[in-house]
Amino acid sequence: VWEPPQGLLASLENLRLVISTGAGVDHILRDPSYPRDVPLVRMVDPGLTQGMIEYVVMATLLCTRRMHRTFAHQANRVWQEEEVRLATDHKVGIMGIGVLGQACASALIGMGYNVMGWSRSPKRLDGVETYHGIDGLEKFLNRSEVLICLLPLTPDTEGILGRGTFNRLPQGAAVINAGRGGHMVEEDLLAALDRGRVEVAVLDVFREEPLPGEHPLWDHPR
C-alpha cells in the first residue's frame, strides 16, 4: 500500500502483513486505528532509490551553480556572470543516512562534493564525515553549505527544518527537502530566505499537498 484511507487497514479482518511501497512508513502510522500487532515493513525499490539520487543530484547542482540567479538574470535580460565554484569547493550535509541517504551520498561523492551525514545513532560510511545525535547536530549544521533532508518523519523530526536549524547553517546556505512536508516549518523558511540566512531552497514535499494556489512559496524567487 501507499497511503490507504484511515480505518481501511483496521477493517481487514485477515490482515497479516502490510508492505509500504513508499520510502517510509509514517504515512501509514498516522492512522490511529492501524492495528499495531500487524507487522509493517517498507519496500526497498531500486527504481525509487535511483529516482531519489537523480533528484538530489539535480537539486544540489541547481543550488551550488546558483541557477536561481542565472534564471533571474535571463528573465530580466541582464548579462551577468556568476562565480563558479566546483563541487570540490562545497560541503554538503545529508540529514538521514539510511538506504536513500547513503545512495545519494555515494553519488555526490562521485561528483567531487565533500559530503557529511547526520543520523540519530552512530554510523560509519566510506568517504562521509558522519555526525550523530543532538551533540553532533550543531557542528554538522555549522558546516553544511547545502543541507539535504532525507529523514523519516517521526515525532522527533517533525519541524526539524525550522528557525533553529536555519540559524545554525552558514550564511547563504541552500536547503533541499526531499523527505516529508512535516519536516519543514514553511513560515521559518520564508523568513530565512527573506533575510538571506538561506540563499535558496528546493522543495519536493509540502505540509499541504497540493500546495494551495495562494501559498507564498509559489511566488518566492528563491
Can you annotate each of these PLM segments?
Residues 1-71:
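Phosphate/diphosphate ligand-binding glycine-rich loop within oxidoreductases
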Residues 7-13, 28-35, 108, 120-129, ...:
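Short loop/helix-cap segments at secondary-structure boundaries that form the rim of catalytic
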Residues 12-16, 35-38, 113, 171-173, ...:
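A short helix->loop->beta-strand "cap" motif at the edges of active sites that frequently abuts
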Residues 37, 88-92, 163, 172:
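Phosphate-coordination loops involved in phosphoryl transfer and adenosine-cofactor binding
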Residues 70-103, 130:
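Glycine-rich NAD(P)-binding loop of Rossmann-like domains
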Residues 91, 113-114:
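Residues at the starts of beta-strands that form the adenosine-phosphate
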